[in-house]
């Protein structure tokens, strides 16, 4: 689900703004106040259209909010609301359009019907005949506040041994403040000896991204329920628990 281009009309600080994306890594450069955060916000809205059809309690379609309307003041008088339009192309779906005419209206999704129909069908297949072979796209968003954010969530959600695959999308585009919750889940699974394949996936991902074949920083993860601690084994021999990881390493682990 690579996004190839996006155009904003009357979105936040942009009257009209168009961006093309390369298929690999894209970097945004700009001075303070030029709209980088607004662009990222718009991209989250566009990417979340996947969840307009692939929808359950673990997913969330963000939509265009009241704060996304352009606000202009002339001689102390605020201008009338202008329709917000976000048009974008995925590699597989072109000319997708989300719009909202006013703050009293909801986000119109008629312009993403092909995508919505596809994702609804994908969710149906996943719910009825999934044997683990159905490939799902990856969505994730992280900000500079990720590990420092404090969120009050129901921990019981992370304590359920068996979760549907959609649980991997839980707040995936609003994921700040989740590090401690995911560490807690690893401890719960290890203690109950349940869903051990989920732990194995995490360990393999850490090893592949941060281990010998990756960044060569962290080689392995050990989960010790009796100590209520998750330890990270560094390639230099150090063993550090999750609470004492430096901000930089904690961010790396959180992203993986």
Where is each model-derived feature located?
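P-loop NTPase switch/coupling surface
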Residues: 1-178, 194-198, 208-214
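Extended helical coiled-coil dimerization/tether regions that scaffold
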Residues: 167-254
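Active-site-flanking alpha-helical
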Residues: 44, 254-255
């Amino acid at each position: 689900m690579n996004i190839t281009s996006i155009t904003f009309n009357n979105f936040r600080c942009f009257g009209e703004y168009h961006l093309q994306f390369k298929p690999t890594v894209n970097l945004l450069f700009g001075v303070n106040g030029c709209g980088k955060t607004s662009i990222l916000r718009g991209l989250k809205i566009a990417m979340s259209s996947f969840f307009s059809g692939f929808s359950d309690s673990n997913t969330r379609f963000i939509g265009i909010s009241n704060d996304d309307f352009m606000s202009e003041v002339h001689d102390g008088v605020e201008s009338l609301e202008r329709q917000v339009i976000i048009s974008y192309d995925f590699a597989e779906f072109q000319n997708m359009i989300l719009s909202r005419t006013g703050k009293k209206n909801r986000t119109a999704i008629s312009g993403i019907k092909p995508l919505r129909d596809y994702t609804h069908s994908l969710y149906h297949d996943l719910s009825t005949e999934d044997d683990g072979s159905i490939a799902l796209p990856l969505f994730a968003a992280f900000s500079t506040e990720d590990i420092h954010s404090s969120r009050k969530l129901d921990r019981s959600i992370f304590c359920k041994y068996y979760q549907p695959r959609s649980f991997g999308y839980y707040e995936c585009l609003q994921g700040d403040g989740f590090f401690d919750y995911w560490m807690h889940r690893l401890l719960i699974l290890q203690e109950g000896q349940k869903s051990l394949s989920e732990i194995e996936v995490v360990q393999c991902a850490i090893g592949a991204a941060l281990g010998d074949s990756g960044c060569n920083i962290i080689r392995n993860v050990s989960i010790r329920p009796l100590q209520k601690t998750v330890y990270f084994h560094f390639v230099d021999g150090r063993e550090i628990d999750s609470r004492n990881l430096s901000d930089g390493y904690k961010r790396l682990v959180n992203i993986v």
